[in-house]
């Protein structure tokens, strides 16, 4: 089966319950991305069962910028989502190009900045238009 759509949603909710049942109460949950708004709804419902103030950020998982933007748009529809936590999605390609000599230091910096700004704008626009 397709892990991201068939298994991840159920496993995420189960993991949330198991962590709370173990006595751990995260302030912010870093949850792997999904392009299905219902995924975030189910996660937020499970979280709010234990803690009405806990929130969600979506992870980048080293996916493409386009994919992470789709996840941000899907998640931003839920009030529990407060942002994103990305790393490799923003910088990995630019760093590889810099190391291989395809980019100057300045070009790498500019690409990383553009990538992060794209994610920020996507989140801001999705939250503004919810």
Mark where each language-model region is:
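Active-site mouth loops of central-metabolism enzymes
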Residues: 1-10, 63
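Catalytic-face loop-and-helix region of soluble metabolic enzyme cores
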Residues: 31-129
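Amphipathic, alpha-helical segments enriched in basic
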Residues: 4, 15-18, 56, 70
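Catalytic beta/alpha-barrel core
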Residues: 8-9, 15-39, 60
């Amino acid at each position: 089966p397709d892990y991201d759509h068939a298994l991840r949603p159920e496993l995420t909710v189960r993991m949330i319950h198991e962590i709370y049942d173990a006595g751990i109460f995260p302030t912010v949950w870093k949850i792997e991305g999904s392009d299905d708004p219902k995924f975030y709804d189910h996660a937020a419902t499970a979280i709010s069962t234990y803690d009405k103030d806990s929130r969600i950020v979506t992870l980048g998982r080293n996916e493409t910028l386009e994919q992470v933007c789709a996840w941000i748009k899907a998640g931003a529809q839920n009030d529990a989502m407060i942002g994103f936590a990305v790393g490799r999605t923003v910088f990995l390609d630019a760093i590889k190009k810099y190391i291989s000599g395809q980019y100057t230091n300045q070009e790498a910096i500019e690409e990383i900045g553009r990538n992060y700004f794209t994610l920020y704008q996507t989140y801001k626009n999705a939250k503004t238009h919810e």
